[in-house]
Structures are given as structure tokens and as C-alpha cells.
């Protein structure tokens, strides 16, 4: 937060938190994040202190019932971009990489990884997922996400998912042409 506040180019800043409750995703898929371990016991009492410190710094501290921080971040980022405001999402969360380069009214959304102290651009997204940011959701739909306990298509990981999406363009087209896939098992599975 200090780094963002010391950057003279920052006009707006919000700190967005997850609530420790289940989200609308759990209603759709009850096993969502079912195997994720609880936060370390010594960390839990610090959460309210971080929120309090954030507010003491005069920063908006946002969290919503039924939504993850990712959902709120994406909504605010797109709304700000539509309003012509340059956006930098500060996070190392791979799920937010789909926002990189998204543009509304010509204002692109950028991402910065504070853990690695480096920006995340389309090249970094391509390196991680094998596709551009706009296709990350398609790759995740095929490969699943073990961190969130979201199953993918059996036998298809990120590399194969990226290969398929790059070949067919998007998930919808891939599924429409699944019968054309050369590998029998993959064709059958899809």
C-alpha cells in the first residue's frame, strides 16, 4: 500500500478483501474451494487489524457478502476503465490475469505482482497459460483449477487446453468441432 500511495500517478486506490464466508460459487458448485486449508491460526486475528489499518490510512476497504475479492476487483477495474481511468490491479492472483490488457474506451487494465515486484503483461500471461489474457477463462474451463477445487476435463491440463484454444479460437468453437479432434480419447472426452 505504501508503494502505491507513494506513486504520484495514483489518483484512486481501494483495498479489497475476501469475506470468510461462502460465495455464490458454492451454491453453483458446493465443492468449490472445499479442500483449501484454513488460514494459519496466527494470521486470522490479523485480518481485522489490517482492515482497521487500511481505514486509518483513509483508504476505502471493500468486501461484499457472497462475492470474492476477485469479483469486486474485476467489476471495479472494468467500471473504472469504462470511465476512462487507468487501472493497475495489484495482485499475484492468477485468476485476475484475464483482466490484463482489457480495455474499455481505450484505457487498458494493467496488473502488478507485488510478490515478485514486477508488472504482469500479456507476455507473462502467455507464458503462464499459453494464451492471451482474453482466453484465460477458456483454458481454465478446460484445465480446471486444483487450488479452487474446480474440476476440468479429465486428461486436459493447461498446456493441452492452451493448444486446443489456440487451434480452435475459443471454447465454444472447440466444443462445436470436438468431433474433428484427432486424438480419440480427447475427442470422446470433449
Model-identified regions with their sequence ranges:
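Extended two-metal-dependent nuclease catalytic cores across DNA- and RNA-processing enzymes
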Residues: 34-190
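Non-catalytic, usually N-terminal nucleic-acid engagement modules in DNA/RNA processing proteins
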Residues: 1-14, 18, 24-27, 31
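Short, active-site-adjacent cap segments at secondary-structure transitions
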Residues: 21-25, 95-98
Amino acid at each position: 500500500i505504501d508503494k502505491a500511495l507513494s506513486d504520484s500517478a495514483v489518483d484512486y486506490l481501494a483495498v479489497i478483501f475476501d469475506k470468510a464466508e461462502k460465495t455464490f460459487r458454492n451454491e453453483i458448485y458446493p465443492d468449490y474451494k472445499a479442500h483449501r486449508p484454513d488460514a494459519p491460526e496466527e494470521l486470522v486475528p490479523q485480518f481485522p487489524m489490517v482492515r482497521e489499518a487500511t481505514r486509518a490510512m483513509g483508504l476505502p476497504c471493500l468486501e461484499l457478502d457472497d462475492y470474492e475479492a476477485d469479483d469486486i476487483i474485476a467489476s471495479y477495474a472494468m467500471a473504472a476503465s469504462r470511465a476512462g481511468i487507468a487501472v493497475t490491479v495489484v495482485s499475484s492472483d492468477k485468476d485476475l490475469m484475464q483482466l490484463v490488457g482489457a480495455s474499455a474506451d481505450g484505457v487498458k487494465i494493467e496488473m502488478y505482482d507485488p510478490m515478485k515486484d514486477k508488472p504482469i503483461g500479456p507476455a507473462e500471461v502467455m507464458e503462464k497459460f499459453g494464451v492471451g489474457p482474453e482466453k484465460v477463462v477458456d483454458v481454465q474451463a478446460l484445465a480446471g483449477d486444483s487450488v479452487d477445487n474446480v474440476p476440468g476435463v479429465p486428461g486436459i491440463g493447461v498446456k493441452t487446453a492452451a493448444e486446443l484454444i489456440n487451434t480452435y479460437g475459443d471454447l465454444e468453437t472447440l466444443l462445436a468441432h470436438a468431433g474433428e479432434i484427432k486424438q480419440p480419447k480427447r475427442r470422446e472426452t470433449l
